[in-house]
Amino acid sequence: MKRTLGHALIIIGAALIVIAVLLPTFLVPRLRVIPLDTVSDTITEVRDGTLLDSSQLGKNEPTPNRKNDPRCKAETDEEKRDLPVHCFINDKTPMQSKRHVEIEEPADEKIATLQVGTTLLRDDRKEPKNLINAILDRITVDRSTAYPVDDPISSVAINAPQGGSDTKPPTFTRPGIQYQFPFGAQKKSYPYYDVQAMRNFEIDFVGEETQDGVKVYKYSMTIPPQNLYESLTEHFTRDGRKLTEADKSSLASMRLSFPAHKWGLEGDDDVELDRYYTNVRTVRVEPTSGVIVNGTEEMFMFYAKDDKEAEEIASKAGREKEAKEQNRTAMKYTAQWDEGSKGRQMDRAKEARKSLTIGGTVAPWILGILGLVPIVIGFRIRSKSA
């Protein structure tokens, strides 16, 4: 009887050790996935930025900060129409960005669809006049890798239009990561999709930091000047799609034509300029979970006649000149996550890391120890009954 009990204990102990060895192989992959109940909100600090006020431009009324500017004095309607663009650029506009992420269908054990609403708001006006820009982004990703699936089902709606089929944005195959880094993020460059430029760029690993007592990886990217009119037109007309009225509305502010003097140039002939965009994006990532725990963007949108002039304006000397003259700026804003956003994202990262640690290390060790105990007891029983 004792010998049988000893054998049974040895078998049980061996089984527990086998489970302990195999547990990380079976359990960890199930934990290294984007949760289907993911919901997150990130908000930036309210900071002053520079903004071309389209409502003031439409009314030919200088922004409050320009009312004492000699260049912006006008009495008659004709004088008001001739006011330079400079008069409608407010360099003291309090701005804030808000982003909401949630999971939508299709979603299952392998894929998840992230629906991301991002709004850029001005803090000195009430709804709905406080809205500067809105984007509704839908991206279906592999839950394990965080990379988009290789199917044309992602979409980006500029200014989040509402309505029928005319307002449905085009669908496309999305390259690059964006809202989540891969689990086990590495010290290397990753392809990153920029939703403003509608293009992929490399985001580079630049070092390690500590945030809330946790090691994080810092990644950064510099996006050179991008012609938004051209990139959006290319996006809207992909696969032979025709421009809709909603598309044309989104494109309207991306290409403007005014007499030369309104742009701060000599002459009265009409000059057509396109809006360009450049950005320096920096993110901090908790490497085990791949969760982004901090974000900063230095965005600059401006008007230029071609790529060459855009490069000149985006250069250090060009930025300094434009900061003084302010004839071409559409928007300039440094967005920095607030403390609440950093804290919430770090909590998500810690929870994911805790689950991975328990599943990959703690639980196997406990099972291994529990397996050794009956094995030792079993051998002792066998030796005594021999």
Swiss-Prot record:
One Pfam family cited in the UniProt record for this chain: PorA
Principal location class: secreted
Annotated keywords: Cell wall, Ion transport, Secreted, Signal, Transport
Compositional bias per record (Polar residues), positions renumbered to this chain: 53-63
Residue span of region Disordered: 53-78
Single GO cellular component term: extracellular region
Start-end of Basic and acidic residues biased regions: 64-78
Name listed for the protein in its UniProt record: Porin PorA
Organism in which the protein naturally occurs: Corynebacterium amycolatum
Gene that specifies this protein: porA
